[in-house]
Regions:
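N-terminal hydrophobic/helix-forming segments and targeting peptides
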Residues: 2-388
Length: 388
């Protein structure tokens, strides 16, 4: 069933969450959906031959992806939705090591995470291998769908402070074990990718949990999954993008999923890179748009930065602003911050609220307590680059 004619399905969301075990895998999953919907891949290194009303996508680094629908008439503006492909995890620094009878691999933290949630659970590995071939270097996705590792907690007998506020040292406490000494993670991943260990030239690998997305609650009203931040929003906005029918002839539509939001978005595949501005420039050139027309079209745009927000924690309601309660199932959230770490202003908030009212979607307002700094996301970083 074409996505445009398909009702939103939690099972489809779960499939996307389960597939996105690394930024490379979530990008590949999104590309597969776009291909099935008739979008044509435009590699950045190739010449583009764009036509009015055409459907296209491009990727960068294999971990960021941007899809667009060309306007059918003279360009007048854009609708855009942005999210990110990465999630907090542990980046693997070394593939093979051993000590005290265990096979080991060194990791370092990626993004902001609750370290304690990584202990004592089955873990696997996901990402890409850069492999030597007869034709050069090839990128291969890899994800053994079985438990390969765990990060063992120190037992209570050796750590009496474990339940009273322990500070974890990631270099010491969060290093995983991969079985008994003598096993080789490099050999395992090479076999998984259909190659040889000696042909692996480099890797981009992370740890991932092995549990699948699932419903929870007495009525199945909630769900739990890894990587909800931000693949939930990535999938929801992709679904919405594919529902679009291009009612306005002069308006183009963009969906983008950047990488490296969790570490500041400053990479070439992040929101502070040139991916979106490069694509816009090539689209505008194909349409014969002048600089004047470009600026006018970009200012006639609504950019939605879609990332997760915080509902009231039932055990710690005092952590939320009680005057602005956000409840699970209460509707989408508009996030405001005086430090401008989100994109929402009075103008954009009003526009978004009006759109939601028309669609019958409830809207909640979120702001941190005045004594809590809160987080940030990519929208404000992107908006200042492309004037949207």
């Amino acid at each position: 069933i074409p996505m445009q004619n398909k009702a939103f399905s939690m099972e489809d969301l779960f499939a996307f969450l389960n597939a996105g075990v690394s930024a490379f895998h979530s990008t590949a999953a999104a590309a597969a959906i776009l291909e099935a919907e008739g979008y044509r891949n435009c590699p950045e290194s190739a010449a583009w031959h764009l036509v009015p009303g055409g459907k296209y996508y491009t990727t960068r680094n294999g971990s960021a992806i941007l899809a667009w629908r060309m306007p059918k008439g003279p360009l007048t503006g854009w609708h855009a939705a942005a999210s990110h492909s990465d999630s907090p995890t542990w980046r693997i620094k070394t593939l093979d090591g051993a000590d005290h009878g265990f096979a080991r691999a060194e990791v370092e933290g990626y993004g902001g995470m609750l370290m304690s949630t990584w202990f004592d659970r089955p873990l696997s590995v996901a990402g890409r291998l850069l492999v030597r071939t007869a034709d050069g270097v090839e990128s291969r996705l890899v994800h053994p769908e079985r438990a390969l590792a765990c990060i063992p907690n120190l037992c209570i007998h050796f750590n009496r402070e474990a339940n009273t506020g322990l500070n974890y040292n990631p270099q010491v406490d969060l290093q995983p074990i991969f079985g008994a000494e003598g096993g080789s993670l490099k050999d395992t991943l090479a076999a998984e990718a259909g190659g040889k260990a000696e042909d692996i030239l480099a890797t981009d690998l992370v740890l991932c949990i092995t549990e699948k997305a699932q419903r929870v609650g007495l009525q199945g009203e909630y769900f739990m999954s890894g990587r909800i931040d931000d693949l939930e929003c990535a999938y929801a906005t992709l679904y919405g993008f594919l529902q679009g029918r291009g009612e306005e002839a002069g308006r183009g539509d963009i969906w983008v999923m950047f990488d490296n939001e969790e570490v500041g978005s400053s990479s070439r595949q992040g929101a502070q890179g040139s991916l979106m501005s490069d694509v816009l420039a090539r689209i505008e050139e194909s349409l014969g748009v002048t600089k004047e027309q470009s600026i006018r079209a970009r200012t006639n745009c609504l950019l939605l930065s879609a990332d997760n927000g915080h509902a009231i924690h039932p055990n710690h309601p005092e952590k939320s602003d009680q005057k602005l309660p956000v409840n699970m199932g209460g509707g989408v959230i508009l996030k405001y911050n005086a430090r401008q770490t989100y994109t929402t202003s009075g103008l954009t908030g009003a526009a978004f609220t009006a759109i939601c009212e028309k669609a019958g979607v409830p809207v909640q307002t979120f702001a941190n307590r005045a004594d809590v700094a809160g987080g940030s996301t990519l929208g404000n970083l992107l908006g200042r680059q492309i004037l949207m």
